[in-house]
Amino acid sequence: MRSAFAAVKPMVGVLALATAMLSPGSPSRAQQATTVDISVKGHHFEPAEIRAPANRAVIIRVKNLDAAAMEFESVSLRIEKVVAAGTQGVVNVRPLAPGRYEFFDDFHQETRGTLVVQ
């Protein structure tokens, strides 16, 4: 006769594997994110329009080439990220529905761009 633990032991392994696959730091989640690079120079985003697939997380790497700090901000994305002069910042965006999402430099309001999600 098998012990009750022997019957449960295989299930523990399955649950551990499922937990590892769904954890935030797992390779499967990281592979689902799309990385987009954007730079700021002369108080302009380059490119001013960036694209990403729908329903996938987006990592936006913002490289500030200006001599002043900038704040990457988006009301629709609910994001604010200060990027010091001459440095790079990373903005993590949740999976989004298709649409256009405006962003701007809060320190220089004329600096504007759009994330197009398709």
Where are these regions (language model features)?
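Short beta-strand/loop motifs in extracellular/secreted proteins, especially
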Residues: 58, 68-70, 113
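Beta-strand-rich interaction surfaces with strong enrichment in secreted/lumenal proteins
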Residues: 48-50, 78-82
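Asparagine-centered strand-capping/turn motif at beta-strand->loop junctions
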Residues: 62-64
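C-terminal segment of classical bacterial N-terminal signal peptides
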Residues: 18-27
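N-terminal edge beta-strand
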Residues: 32-55
